[in-house]
């Protein structure tokens, strides 16, 4: 039997390392995508923190703020619905006073039916999109450091 507890206002840090360069916050089906992105980036030697934000209202502000501060003030939220009123809003609000940038991956068009892998890809919330977002952040950081 699974004895794991899920407290209201809580979250679970699934992957954490001192070398984490960004934090990915996901909920529901996008947690699987975040885990896959973690595995792909790890093969390239890139560490990301992955948080399952199973409670969105209220959101786990202390965990998110700490993660953001420890991972270069960068958080990527990934949600399988529209951006407004969802995970991205909750994460942005939680870290707003701490100079943490939140990149929000969410469904931005009318949902359709189809295979889940195809839909996750189409809506920009797949593991591939998470990996690309992390890479873009690292690239822009390196350009700033060189200038």
Predicted segment positions?
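Thiamine diphosphate
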Residues: 1-147
């Amino acid at each position: 039997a699974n004895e794991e507890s899920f407290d209201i206002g809580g979250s679970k840090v699934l992957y954490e390392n001192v070398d984490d360069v960004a934090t990915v916050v996901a909920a529901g089906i996008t947690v699987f995508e975040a885990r896959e992105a973690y595995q792909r980036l790890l093969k390239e030697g890139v560490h990301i923190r992955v948080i399952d934000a199973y409670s969105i209202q209220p959101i786990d502000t202390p965990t998110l703020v700490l993660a953001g501060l420890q991972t270069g003030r960068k958080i990527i939220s990934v949600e399988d619905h529209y951006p407004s009123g969802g995970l991205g809003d909750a994460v942005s609000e939680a870290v707003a006073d701490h100079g943490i940038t939140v990149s929000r991956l969410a469904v931005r068009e009318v949902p359709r039916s189809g295979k889940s892998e195809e839909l996750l890809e189409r809506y920009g919330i797949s593991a591939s999109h998470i990996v690309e977002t992390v890479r873009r952040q690292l690239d822009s950081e390196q350009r700033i450091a060189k200038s």
